[in-house]
Structure formats: structure tokens, C-alpha cells
Amino acid sequence: KEICDNLHVRGLAERNDSSPDVKPYIQETKTEWVPVDLSSDMKIIQRYLKIALDQRYIELRRNGLRLSDNKSLSQLLNARQFVLKQNRRSANPLFTAIRITYALNIFEAHGITPFLKFCDRTKSKKGAGIKELFETDQNFTKAIELAKTQQANGIEHPKIDKLTEILRSVESKVLIFSSYRDS
């Protein structure tokens, strides 16, 4: 909705390769995924976020939750009903782990500014573990502090620089698929 409003778009029409009005114009395309590593400074922030998340997983396991080593948002979301009905002492670490997972995903995929905006919005809410996360979790607060420093230095996600580099070296038409997140 926000994108449509910003572009002053009133209606959307969905098409794909097999749509009758599109099919005659489909050409062979070359798709290339270009992996982009985070900068060393961003990896430090990422490490602090992962340590904060690991601490929640340790606490949840200590409280009797069976969680795999594969840390995923879906695993945490699936544990909500069990925790709310049968293991209330795990509510705080569970909901905090969910928030950290969201923050980590935003940081890795979208960069520093969306991560900090997410943190600002989350900090202003009320809920299980928010105060602890933003006031006493040394790893999470250190990640925010480092991210603010990087933002002040003009550092964002390295995918933007990589995209610019690729576009300067290509002479053909290019389609860029992007994920937009600011919520």
C-alpha cells in the first residue's frame, strides 16, 4: 500500500509469463544471483545479535522447550501456543527471541537503517521482554550502538554498492528485483 501511495498508483494488475497479453513478448532471460557478504563491521553487529539470540535459545531449552539447532522464526512462532498454555515462564525469552530474529533478518537483508527503525518501533511498544532487551541485554544494546555508529558514518548494506558496480559494467537491459521493508 505504501509503495502504491508513493507512486500514486490506484490499481494493480497481476501478470505472469503465461498471461495471454504478455506471452508474445517474453524473451529468454539470464538470471544471476549475486551473493553479497556483509562488511566486517556489519558482521560484528550480526555476531552480537546472534549471541543475544543464542542466549534466549539456551534459556528456552533450560525451561524444557525442544528447539532444533536450526534457529528459525517459524520454529519460534510454532512454540507460542505451547508456551502460552503450558510453559508461561518461557514467554519472556520466547517473545524476545522472536523480536531478535526479526531484527537479525531485517539487518541481514535490508541493512542498518531499517534495522534501527525496527528497533525504534519495537522499543516504543509494550510487551514481554522489550524493556530487558533494550535496557539490560548487553549484546543487543551493543549491536544497536555499533549500528548507530555505522549509520553516522554513512554505512548501509553492501548490496547497494555491489548493485551499482554491476550496473556500471552491464550494457544490456537489466531487471532488478528488490525486497522493500520498512515495517
Task: Describe each region flagged by the PLM.
Residues I3, V9-K23, D41-S183:
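Helicase motor interdomain insertion/brace
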Residues L7-R10, T29-T31:
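Short glycine-/polar-rich loops that comprise or flank the Walker A/P-loop
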